[in-house]
Amino acid sequence: TVLMDELAKTLELAKKLFPSIKEVSVETDPQIMGDPQIHMLEGLVDRMSIGVQSFDDGILKMTERDKFGTGQEVFENIAKAQELFPICNVDMIFGFRGQTDEILQRDLETLLKLSPRQITTYPLMVTSQTKRSVKDSIAAPHDVMAGQYRMILDMLTKEYTQLSSWAFGKSNNEGFDEYVIDNDEYLGVGSGAFSFLGDSLYVNTFSLRRYNERIGSGNNGVERRKVFGKRSILQYRLLLQLFAGRISRKYFKDVHGVDLDRALFKEVLALKLAGAIKENPEDHDRFIVTDKGKLLGLVMMKDFYSAMDNIRAELRKPLKEADM
């Protein structure tokens, strides 16, 4: 449940305390777009992202998201409210068991009819915390995903520009909420937030009680830290650039002080041999990321985010009721 007035006050306070804030992105469920109070966020939110997953009633029921309304109701709620925000993004998921090509095609046709400013098509992500029986009941076989991704590219790129392996926008200079791509460092604020600064990943405590105690005593909320070596950081940035569809030799030279082809010789060679990237005859600095590369980037980021979800689940596991 979203307390719209409290969210509006929080955003107003954040902008007052941090005048340098340029964009505010908010995630929500479909039924919130049908709430009359959604107008309170007009002018405060630059990008509204709605987790739809599918417009198919069968899939919505299977994933227990029919509580947010039927596919038609979801469509109507978004259609009414999307003009309130400069950017409206619709999150979809593919790779469900029982999601036939016909169902996916109807979803994509519905998306094109809705015509949001941005579309994100995530592959189904199932973490190690999910029971095997549940995985088997909702996840399609792995060989299905490549064909579905091909359909997504063929249909969406007719009207949208591809921004990353799974993001599409009306223009090629869209702002989209994959801050890890464009920022080597980022700071997370709040309980359970992640930060990457220097060579370290920091995780704030997931206990609201401990977080409040730490902040109240003048400390930060960090509970875990993981230090990464130079090579691991370079591999991480190569993954993100593959996912973004733009691998730049100049970036690695200017930011990390290395020759990409030498520092990650095996990785670059493997990507070339796999047909994921190829030399750009018009720009030696940038590789061309092929459709195979986009699919590879999508699969690798899927596994990366699933691993992050596993970390969250492990850190939440010991929490007691008093921590919530």
Go through each PLM region and give its residues:
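C-terminal scaffold of the Radical SAM
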Residues: 1-258, 319, 323
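Short Gly/Ser/Thr- and Asp/Glu-enriched loop/turn motifs at secondary-structure junctions
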Residues: 89, 281-284
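Extended hydrophobic-aromatic, low-complexity segments
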Residues: 249-251, 262-264, 280
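Short amphipathic alpha-helical interaction segments
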Residues: 258-273
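A short, conserved structural fragment
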Residues: 272-282
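Minor-groove-contacting beta-hairpin "wing" of winged helix-turn-helix DNA-binding domains
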Residues: 284-290
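Short, amphipathic alpha-helical interaction segments positioned at domain boundaries
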Residues: 292-324
